[in-house]
Amino acid sequence: GHIQHILRLAIKGGNIDLKITGLENIPAENGFMMYANHQGMFDVLAIAASCDAPMGAVLKKELYDIPFLHQIAVCTKSFAMDREDVRQSLTVIQQVTEEVKQGRAYLIFPEGTRSRKGNEMLEFHGGSFRCATKSKCPVVPVALVDSYKVLDEKGSKPVTLQLHYLAPIPY
């Protein structure tokens, strides 16, 4: 769609070489969940630009409060999760589960926050997999390599970002 086209132009204009492997691993139909490591703010944009499936994401509540991001979240049927509010989190899990059952894809970062250690991953939050188990859908693991370099404050040097869609794990 239009958002995807804009994202692809931004990537090209932003001096980013996006190397993508495994697009054939993205299910062509029915809903699924993508679980990716989280290195930086650019992660969602890289995945959204490369994945043709209608996709939403589960965001931390603080991002949903930023006006421009809020509009994009609404347009993509993304949901904000308040990690301090268990009842609200359960509601989001139920909403995502229903959307996945209707054929939509959702992206979750199971680390819950960005790793500040380059390509090193943080521990996963166990609850982040509830959407996949409740919706009984395939899980597509996504590996991002060097995306932390993209919005680095050091300037506008060319960056090569690797994005790997791994084989789906069936329910």
Where on the chain are the PLM-derived regions?
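Anionic-ligand binding region
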Residues: 88-97
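A cross-family acyltransferase "interaction/gating" segment
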Residues: 68-71, 101-107, 116-171
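Short glycine-rich anion-binding loops that position phosphate/pyrophosphate groups of nucleotides
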Residues: 38-40, 111-115
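Short gly/ser/thr-rich secondary-structure transition/capping motifs
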Residues: 13-21, 89-90, 145-147
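Generic preference for hydrophobic
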Residues: 20, 34, 57-58, 163-165
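Residue-level preference for the first positions of well-ordered beta-strands
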Residues: 31-33, 105-109
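Short acidic-hydrophobic, aromatic-tinged amphipathic segments that line or gate anion-handling sites
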Residues: 20, 79-82, 171
